[in-house]
Amino acid sequence: MKVRPSVKPICEKCKIIKRGGRVMVICENPKHKQKQG
């Protein structure tokens, strides 16, 4: 899980979702998981 000021999809399987008011990227590749913070 990476915490960054701006989250962007890295590959075509990355999905941007909102969880509890936080923007996150979920993906099949665990290296692509990101959280905004």
Curated annotation (Swiss-Prot):
PROSITE patterns: RIBOSOMAL_L36. Keywords: Ribonucleoprotein, Ribosomal protein. GO terms for cellular component: cytoplasm; ribonucleoprotein complex; ribosome. This is Large ribosomal subunit protein bL36. Belongs to the bacterial ribosomal protein bL36 family. One of its GO terms (biological process) is translation. NCBIfam families: rpmJ_bact. One of its GO terms (molecular function) is structural constituent of ribosome. The keyword Transcription does not apply. SUPFAM superfamilies: Ribosomal protein L36 (SSF57840). It comes from the Bacteria.
